[in-house]
Amino acid sequence: MAAKFFDIEEQHPTQRFSDLVGEHCRMLMPIEGYEKKPLVTLEEAVEPIVEYVPDVRRRVYFAKTKCAELSPGELSIDEAASITLYSMEWQPQDKCLYHVLNKTLRNENRQKLTPWFLFLKLILTALGHLPSMARTVYRGVKKDIRHEYPEGRTLVWWGFSSCTSKLSVLQNELFLGRTGPRTFFTIECDSGKDIRKYSCYQAEDEILLPAARQFKVVACLSQGNDFYMIQLKEIQPLFPLIELVPQPSPSPAMHIVPKPPIQPAGRNIQKLIDIG
């Protein structure tokens, strides 16, 4: 039987999709050290962060149970479940794994990332097994933040960023909506990962940008009625902002789950608003 994940219509408004305000966009020291850690199970990977994410052990159980129901594919259960765990939300919101992780990735004190190294190794290994997508994706926030994105600025989003290629998702009142101050981002990316197969919110067809992506502001436009559009283009830094994970060859005996199908670049996908 195919795994049944949560559906967005059954959910309350999600803060992860509007977590954009936390991105200060400044240049920090690169993210390094995690790539030297061993690849371990998800249970082992979260042990060092239990004090920061108190409910994480229980959430790992749910994530791995869901991923175990998927048919064999290209990710191990632990790799797939690391993505599922990242997409989960619960109360209190500031204790969700995605929230604490992204907040730590944006912190100038890189030593605070040390407890996260095992999890970063696992989820970035998983994302490394998925093909990168060169396409335009979208995200937005119910706030006027255009002054932080002047035309020509080069910036970095240090956290993982959830995006969508389906504009109708952002128009939903749970996300960007149609009224009030709104900042809408169109992002020409080349590192997007289609994670909808592994997300708790499959109906939204999420495209996830990995941590430490650099962008240039191509344009910043006012569309009237407190609606602002910012065009970003992903660019490659002179030196890596995050050390890459060496990609091991999967074991023939490894239980792996399927890679999600990729839609053509001209078609819509779907999702979020977590810019930061």
Language model segments and positions:
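A generic structural signal for well-ordered coil/turn residues at beta-strand boundaries
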Residues: 134, 181-183, 203, 211, ...
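Internal glycine-rich, Lys/Arg-flanked active-site/core loops of soluble domains
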Residues: 43-198
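Generic cytosolic/nucleocytoplasmic N-terminal low-complexity/intrinsically disordered segments
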Residues: 3, 36, 63, 94, ...
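Residues that form ligand- and interface-recognition hot spots within folded domains
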Residues: 123, 141-142, 167, 174, ...
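Intrinsically disordered, low-complexity, charge-biased terminal/linker regions in eukaryotic proteins
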Residues: 1-73
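Compositionally biased, intrinsically disordered/low-complexity regions enriched for serine, proline
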Residues: 10, 27, 35, 45, ...
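Cys-His-centered catalytic/binding microenvironment captured across papain-like cysteine peptidases
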Residues: 2-33, 199, 207-276
